Amino acid sequence: MSDSGTLSLIGGIVFLVLWVVVWSICLLGWRTARIRYAHPNIPSRLSKLPVSSAPGVTIIRPLCGLDQNLYNTLESVMKLDYPKFEVIFAVQDEKDEALPVVNMVMEKYPEVEAKVIIDSRKVGVNPKVNNLMTPFQEAKYDLLWILDSTCSVLPGTLGRSVEAFFSNTSSTASPYDPESSPLLSISDDVRKPPIAGEVGLVHQVPIAVCYQKTWGSLIEQAYLNTTHAKMYLAINATSIDSCVVGKSCMYSRDNISHLTTPSPSLRSLPDPPSGLAGFGPFLAEDNMIGLSLWHELKLKHAMTSDVVLDFIGSLSVRDYINRRVRWIRVRKKMTLAATLLEPLTESIISGLYGAWAISRLLGGNILPLFLLHMAAWISVDISTKRALETNIKGIGPPESKVTFLMAWAARECLALPIWMLAMTSSEVVWRGQKYKIIASGEAIRLGDRN
C-alpha cells in the first residue's frame, strides 16, 4: 500500500471513530430527554409539607428593562406550589422600566412574600452579578434560586428542585407517603449547607418559546430546543464536569460565600473578594460559579424533570449571529480545546467526514451516506424536542413544522460560518456595552457601543 493509501486508511479510521463518538454523545442526550422528560411530571412531596418543616427558598429575579413577556415570567414564581418561599425582584435603577410590571404582579399576589431591592452598586463588569449582590445579603433563606428575567417555570418546579437539592438524604421512607419523608427533618433550623460529594447546584434545561416569528428568533428557538438541549443533557449525564447555562440555578448562599475568586486579576489584589463578588469580572458568571462549586467545593450538580421556559424576543438573523458569536468568543477563553473541536460535532461537518470514512473503509457512495446521516440527525433532534415539550404543551403559539425545518436547516448551515467569525476576535457586545475577553475568561470593558 502506498503512503497516500496508508494515510487515507488511518484518516478513515480516525474519522470513523470520531463520528461514532459524536453520535454516541447525541444519542446520550436524546436518551436522557426521552427517559427524564417524556412523561408527566410527578408532584413533589414537598408541596404537602407544613411551613415549619419545609426548607425555605429565596427566589431572586434580577431585572433590567422590559424583557419579552415580562409580566408572565414574573407571575410564574408567584404561583409556585411550595409552602415556604420569598421573592426578591432586583433592579439597579429606580427608574427601571421593569418596576411598574413588578408592582402589578405584587399587587395581584399580596399573599406571596415579595419585595423589591434597588441598588446601583457595582463590583465588576457583569451587570447581573452587580444586581445580585444586595439580594444575596438580604435573602431570608440560605437556599437561593436565581431565575433570569426572560424565564418562566411551572408551579411544581420549585418543589422538585428542592427535592433534588436534598437528594443525598438517605432514607427507607416510602416515596408515596409524604409524612414519612426524610425531608421533614430538613427544616431551616437543623439543616446544614451541602458538603463535598453532595448536590450543591440544581438547574434545568432551557426551552425557547417564540411569540415573535422573526427568522432570527426562529433559528434561535430551533437551536436551543434541539442541538443545545441535546448536548446540554448529554454533557450533564456524563457528570465529567460542570456544565451550567445559568437560566435557572439553585444553590446555597453559604456555599457561594466560601468560593474563592477564579479571577487572576482579583487574586492579585492584597485582599481579593470572595463569594459572589469574585465572579464580577466574568460575563459567563453562572458557568464560572458552577465550575467553582464543582472543583473547589466538590459539589455535584443535579437536574430535575422540569424545563425552564425562555421567552425569546424579536431577533433578526444578524442578532442571532451576534449572540452566538458572543458566547463562542467567551467560551473559547474558558474551554479552548472544546471550542476548537466544536465544528466536528455539528451535523453537516460530522456527516461529511463520517460519510467519507464509511465509504473509505466499508465502501459505498458518499452522498447517500451523508443524506442518511442528516435524516437520522434531524429525526433525533425532533424526538428530543418533542420529549422536552411533554409538560409544556399548549404554552406558546402554534408551531409550523415547515417553518421549524427551515429554521433548523438555517441553524445547521450557519454553524460553521458563525464559529469561524467567532475565532477572528475576542471582542463582544453585551447589552450595548463592548468588552474584550482575555485569556482567563474575564471581560474588560472597552467603552460604550457606537
UniProtKB/Swiss-Prot annotation:
Pathway: Lipid metabolism; sphingolipid metabolism. Residues 1-8, 359-361, 423-450 are lumenal. The D1, D2, D3, (Q/R)XXRW motif is a critical part of the GCS active site, involved in catalysis and UDP-sugar binding. It is found in: Golgi apparatus membrane. It catalyses: an N-acylsphing-4-enine + UDP-alpha-D-glucose = a beta-D-glucosyl-(1<->1')-N-acylsphing-4-enine + UDP + H(+). Disruption phenotype: Results in complete loss of glucosylceramides (GluCers) in mutant cells. Residues 30-337, 383-401 are cytoplasmic. The active site is at residue 286. It comes from Cryptococcus neoformans var. grubii serotype A (strain H99 / ATCC 208821 / CBS 10515 / FGSC 9487). One of its GO terms (molecular function) is ceramide glucosyltransferase activity. Its EC number is 2.4.1.80. GO terms for biological process: glucosylceramide biosynthetic process. This is Ceramide glucosyltransferase.
